[in-house]
Amino acid sequence: MMKIGVFVPIGNNGWLISTHAPQYMPTFELNKAIVQKAEHYHFDFALSMIKLRGFGGKTEFWDHNLESFTLMAGLAAVTSRIQIYATAATLTLPPAIVARMAATIDSISGGRFGVNLVTGWQKPEYEQMGIWPGDDYFSRRYDYLTEYVQVLRDLWGTGKSDFKGDFFTMNDCRVSPQPSIPMKVICAGQSDAGMAFSAQYADFNFCFGKGVNTPTAFAPTAARMKQAAEQTGRDVGSYVLFMVIADETDDATRAKWEHYKAGADEEVLSWLTEQSQKDTRSGTDTNVRQMADPTSAVNINMGTLVGSYASVARMLDEVASVPGAEGVLLTFDDFLSGIETFGERIQPLMQCRAHLSALTQEVA
């Protein structure tokens, strides 16, 4: 079975950088409605990112953002089955604090919580607070994250850490209570360094889908992750990010997609390109360089599935056929209606979710 998750819109306007796309602010009530609807349709998990400074432009893209841990704590309290993941911007939060917050949300959720660790690539997010460690950090960020996760594992596993490293020094550091079950750690490494980290420490790794209606184009990325995991003797699957834009017919959906592209906020796209060029130390295979690619920058170049309900179902089944692909993380042009049509019209047609069809119909 392929896992299905929703990438909740913690920032304004979700993931479409377009004046023609729905314009909305992030609120707890909106995200509660989205995640409860996702749970109703048997989505497996919900994840929120963290963004500390937006991209500006006419659409004020991501200038308005909630905070990930507090949002997901609230969502954990109003759900009962769906897995909940928050994102830690590790430059802003000491690992001992993240360990304690995660243990708290584990208690709120009844063991349904996990943590997504990010190193931070957007320099202005951290410069505005005076905590950017300098541009050498670009080349050492996974060294930093390795120490960070070792402290987390100590505290979650034993309740105590005396870790000593280049970045962190723990002196009989304590966290109790500990999580009720082993805490899941996820990452989104796409560079060689990121995948090596995920292979060693993550439970699964997110990657970008690629292109428009090319559902298996990410296969080389999944293969790289699989190969990296084989080096560590661990099973670390890939979860792939896609935007779903669906309607009754392929033509109607294609027209909607072209309309969104025609309204692209060029000021935001230029700024994103500029930011992607700031990191000259991490190589050419990072997530941010894919985000800024002009091919489909209107939705940050995540894989895009545009078509009728049947076409999208077929393409998601193709995703499931890729070796190493264990799940997808979905965004929608309109989240509330998108999740409903996914649950009612797309998921029942998916072979990789066929076992849920009868169950979904019972609760619909």
Curated annotation (Swiss-Prot):
Catalytic activity: uracil + FMNH2 + NADH + O2 = (Z)-3-ureidoacrylate + FMN + NAD(+) + H2O + H(+); thymine + FMNH2 + NADH + O2 = (Z)-2-methylureidoacrylate + FMN + NAD(+) + H2O + H(+)
Highest taxon of the lineage: Bacteria
Gene3D superfamilies: Luciferase-like domain
Top EC class for this record: oxidoreductase
Induction: Up-regulated by the nitrogen regulatory protein C (NtrC also called GlnG) and repressed by RutR.
GO function terms (MF aspect): alkanesulfonate monooxygenase activity; uracil oxygenase activity
UniProt-listed Pfam families: Bac_luciferase (PF00296)
InterPro entries per the UniProt record, alphabetical: Luciferase-like_dom (IPR011251), Luciferase-like_sf (IPR036661), Pyrimidine_monooxygenase_RutA (IPR019914), SsuD_RutA_monooxygenase (IPR050172)
Record keywords, A-Z: Flavoprotein, FMN, Monooxygenase, NADP, Oxidoreductase
Catalytic activity, EC: 1.14.99.46
SUPFAM superfamilies per UniProt: Bacterial luciferase-like
Residues annotated to bind FMN: 50-51, 116, 125, 141-142, 191
Biological function: The FMN-N(5)-oxide reacts spontaneously with NADH to produce FMN. Requires the flavin reductase RutF to regenerate FMN in vivo.
The family this protein is said to belong to: Belongs to the NtaA/SnaA/DszA monooxygenase family. RutA subfamily.
Stated name of the protein: Pyrimidine monooxygenase RutA
Organism ancestry: Bacteria, Pseudomonadati, Pseudomonadota, Gammaproteobacteria, Enterobacterales
Gene that specifies this protein: rutA
